[in-house]
Amino acid sequence: MKQNNLKPKLGQHFLIDEKIKKIIIDSVKDTKNKNILEIGPGEGAITNKLIDISNNYLGIEYDQSLCKKLSGRYKKNPNVKFLNEDAGIFDVLKLKNYIPNDYILVGNLPYYSSNKIVRNFISSSFKPLALVVMIQKEVANNYLLKI
């Protein structure tokens, strides 16, 4: 990561495993819904592929420098937007300004805030149709215990 001038902070962990990337993309590519919200796109490890399979794409990135970089990279695509926001406290109803109807939430969530982010979106009246997220094993086990 140092060679790419990346300095993970804020609990970030950057997705580099090609097998995991493929699993995530395969999980959403055949769905009828093509509105995709990506939480924490970071350097854009799966962003291109998500954009290729979506009608509307919105990325929420907390790191201002990464958000600016991604916004510049995709500025010519009118169906792609990035917001510099904290997904854990983001007003989910604002999504309707960018994604007009049902959406799928995809993300490689920061460990320290994954619970807060997931709860923010599933407790909203504008819930995602599906979540395809990578989270810490202990957080996943905690969700399973509550079901």
Regions found by a protein language model. Name each.
Residues 1-147:
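Catalytic cores of RNA-modifying enzymes
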